[in-house]
Amino acid sequence: MNYELLTTENAPVKMWTKGVPVEADARQQLINTAKMPFIFKHIAVMPDVHLGKGSTIGSVIPTKGAIIPAAVGVDIGCGMNALRTALTAADLPENLAELRQAIETAVPHGRTTGRCKRDKGAWENPPVNVDAKWAELEAGYQWLTQKYPRFLNTNNYKHLGTLGTGNHFIEICLDESDQVWIMLHSGSRGIGNAIGTYFIDLAQKEMQETLETLPSRDLAYFMEGTEYFDDYLKAVAWAQLFASLNRDAMMENVVTALQSVMQKTVKQPQTLAMEEINCHHNYVQKELHFGEEIYVTRKGAVSARAGQYGIIPGSMGAKSFIVRGLGNEESFCSCSHGAGRVMSRTKAKKLFSVEDQIRATAHVECRKDAEVIDEIPMAYKDIDAVMAAQSDLVEVIYTLRQVVCVKG
């Protein structure tokens, strides 16, 4: 048995956390969630677990007959995309700053501060590939905004194919054989945040009379068979599609940027299914487990069915992994979505300096300023320990090291 069993007054919690730290607040948050009467069998916890807003990051929450919107959160469909290119390290330019600049030009990122009307994190004039992907989203958007007009006043179309901020990133990486990979991390951007926030608030309002009886107000839920349950599932499915297409559009534009800098073909003919991977790690969907159809919420966790490829990034100074799932049913066929934080962003900014950031990322062409100190590698768990703790969930196919990193 490779997991720790945490017993509660209701469902148990199975934690793949051997050799990695788990803060007491995260344990209590997991216990609170496990108290809910509709938890199916047990909660599974990944080794990158840490305290989260709404629910615990690195948790897999299986439910029957209900869904907790705050467990999915506001970064709906957040996930990873990775592409193995036809390039090798020898093809990369000596000046990697030029490459980083080309990517930053190709993909809007960051957020506007102050009184500037221009949103630097959005497109002014979206390119053709964004238009094509928006066409796949338009029917769902029409339903969403007709039923909930509040979503008309959101960043949607102009956020498609954009990176965002925080821990979202685009990286150029090398594997063990010096093959070049493109890897990126983003979600459903402004519209997903708006959908998540609205339905979390709505669930709490709907349960206003009984809210105080819950272990936490963040555990407010929609019951299956109600209108809001159905609407939430439909809205979340749309946001998850937005997130997937968002990553696809960014990947296409990064490939184009690399080709313009290097004057070489970047994308090789696809011969293996795993050569391009696009996976969510913040989402909910219906799945079959232990012979029953249930709703699985992965909050900072990746699907790892037998033979399924996934992406587990480290921090901006640590290695990352392309993995293949082992289909461990006890984890609801899941694995970690990264290394996991060992401290809050606020604490990291107080504890570390720009000089620390420069030293920790000396081998990476990336931002090294005060605004990204909260993403310093030391703010995250040891990725090797995280991988060791989930050796029965996934097998490593490629180990990547980054050479260029773009942050919002």
Swiss-Prot record:
Which cofactors must be present for this protein to function? Mn(2+)
Q: Where is the active site?
A: 337 (gmp-histidine intermediate)
Q: List the disulfide bonds.
A: none
Q: Which major enzyme category is it? A: ligase
According to its UniProt entry, one GO biological process term is: RNA repair
Residues the record lists as binding Mn(2+) 2: 78, 185, 281
Residues annotated as binding Mn(2+) 1: 75, 78, 168
Q: What is its EC number?
A: 6.5.1.8
Protein role:
GTP-dependent RNA ligase that is involved in RNA repair. Joins RNA with 2',3'-cyclic-phosphate or 3'-phosphate ends to RNA with 5'-hydroxy ends. GTP-dependent RNA ligase that is involved in tRNA repair. Repairs broken tRNA(Asp) and tRNA(Arg) that have been cleaved by colicin E5 or colicin D, respectively. Does not repair damaged 16S rRNA in 30S ribosomal subunits.
The UniProt family comment states: Belongs to the RtcB family.
The entry's other comment says: Ligation proceeds through 3 nucleotidyl transfer steps, with 2',3'-cyclic phosphate termini being hydrolyzed to 3'-P termini in a step that precedes 3'-P activation with GMP. In the first nucleotidyl transfer step, RtcB1 reacts with GTP to form a covalent RtcB-histidine-GMP intermediate with release of PPi; in the second step, the GMP moiety is transferred to the RNA 3'-P; in the third step, the 5'-OH from the opposite RNA strand attacks the activated 3'-P to form a 3',5'-phosphodiester bond and release GMP.
Indicate the quaternary assembly.
Answer: Monomer.
| Protein name (Swiss-Prot/TrEMBL) | RNA-splicing ligase RtcB1
- Organism of derivation: Escherichia coli (strain ATCC 25922 / DSM 1103 / LMG 8223 / NCIMB 12210 / NCTC 12241 / WDCM 00013 / Seattle 1946)
